Amino acid sequence: MSEALKAIEQFLEELSKRVRVEKAYLFGSYAKGTQIKTSDIDLIIVSPDFRGMPYLKKLDLINEIQWKLSIKPFIEAIPLTPEELEVKLKESVVIRDASKYWIRVNWPPPPP
């Protein structure tokens, strides 16, 4: 899991240079503790700066950072505004299920 936490921190640090990361949630196999060697890291990223940004542009930003950093394990992120998260919690089975066990990522990390 420490490798995953390092990858998440690197990813969020780079993303934070481009948008304000209000919240980040880890879900999927890493949150459940059932990951295997080939598992990716599933994140929900919440930022008010995603407002008005077309979804494909959000994904391009996420993918650009992923490939720039060559992070392993691979991070599969879902970029949402705070309002989109509220809607998804009601309408998306995947997000609603994830909310039952997700782990909020402490970002930005507290000072040492």
Residue ranges and their predicted role:
Residues 42-46:
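Short beta-strand->loop micro-motif that forms the acidic, two-metal-ion catalytic signature
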